[in-house]
Amino acid sequence: MELVQPFSGFLVYDLKQTPEDFQVEEILPSDLIQKTGKWMIFRLQKSGWNTLDALLRISKESKVSIFEIGYAGKKDRHASTSQYISCQKPLRVPKELTKVIQLDKIGFSKKSLSTELNVGNRFQLVLRNLLEKEIESIRNNFEKITKNGFINYYDSQRFSRFHSEFRLPILPFFKGDAETCLKLILTDPFPGEKKQARDRKKILYDLWGNWSQCEKWSKSKLEKNIFSNLKKEKKPTQKTYSDLILRFPEEELLMLVSSFQSLIWNEFVSEIFISDNFTGVWIKTKTGPLFFPGESSIQSVPFSKNLPVPGNPGIYKLEYSKKEIDTLKKILNQNGLTESVLDSSPFPIIKMNSFERKVRILPNDFQIGDFEEDDQHPGKRKVKISFRLPSGVYATMLIKRLMLRSRI
């Protein structure tokens, strides 16, 4: 990807200093919650916990399989969040967690909750550590977003498994190296993972190939099972590693696939803007540079514009123009892949279907408060902002546009 346009940094700010600085409220269809129904609907409020970990503790305490609990979306642990879950059986929170996880039954539904029922999210955020001299720039960017919106890129939360050399675990898998894929899944730490967990994964990384020792350092039943099987193999083949990857929960395999689709879509969109001679700036992200168009360029992208996220049934059967197909092939080639990887899912039990995604998003009810003294940073300012976004749109990407240093 040619980076002819300039790079831009960001204005000074801190986000998520406390969970209360990042408040998220899930929005469901107005007619979904009823007075009667097969499924009970609960409001789940949490702070400092991600959704899946909270559900695991709730399911264990309630003696209910986690697969019996429906939810419409996952929420970050570095936030104070309110969302909804469904179950046909009563649910409760462990007593020791009631200060950080609250669960209230609020009604019933005729169907279990799923991601298709997530209408969007309402956000209330606090930006801290702001410089007085940069307030004018923030206000200017606020006006630009209110008028022009922002580009609907996937943000870093989508890529929790990102490696500096291999990028995503699934990329080596596509290239026939299932062993490296498995190694990354088992040994590459997540951002924010505790030191003890990171140290254990480092030990597994160093011991890789010594399956008996790896088995001793295993923590979960799945890890023990994987290393036990490898110990029995005299010469594991790529098929051996591939079959072992299929033992991971469907949720984890789905994340491997969806993060790949998201990465390709991000780079696809940026490359299209550049090929259309858009003016603007690049920003640096964990997964690589992304292009933010300037005002005149972004206004040429209709709010109704959708660009399919690449996937099954393959790029030639999707509604791409010839130029878009050529651009997508270029992006895949830069990642060492051919277009055939998008014809079907690499895992038989997981779908990798294409779906429509809006390119440009206009936030609803976007408001900015007064700039006040920051109680956590003497001499600095803080400001409260609020807005609503459709499901699947990243609030942190809006913040990146709001805090962009370049005036575009």
UniProtKB/Swiss-Prot annotation:
Please give the SUPFAM superfamilies that the UniProt record associates with this protein. Pseudouridine synthase
PROSITE patterns per the UniProt record, alphabetical: TRUD (PS50984), UPF0024 (PS01268)
Give residue ranges for domain TRUD: 149-362
Catalytic residue list: D76 (nucleophile)
Reaction equations catalysed: uridine(13) in tRNA = pseudouridine(13) in tRNA
Query: What does the record give as EC number?
Result: 5.4.99.27
Going by the UniProt record, its keywords in alphabetical order are: Isomerase, tRNA processing
Q: Which Gene Ontology terms describe the biological processes this protein takes part in?
A: pseudouridine synthesis; tRNA pseudouridine synthesis
Q: From the Swiss-Prot or TrEMBL record, what is one GO molecular function term?
A: RNA binding
Matching entries from InterPro entries are given as: PsdUridine_synth_cat_dom_sf, PsdUridine_synth_TruD, PsdUridine_synth_TruD_CS, PsdUridine_synth_TruD_insert, TruD_catalytic
Do you know which Pfam families this protein is assigned to?
TruD (PF01142)
Major enzyme class = isomerase
Q: What task does this protein carry out?
A: Responsible for synthesis of pseudouridine from uracil-13 in transfer RNAs.
Q: Which family does it belong to?
A: Belongs to the pseudouridine synthase TruD family.
Protein name, as recorded? tRNA pseudouridine synthase D
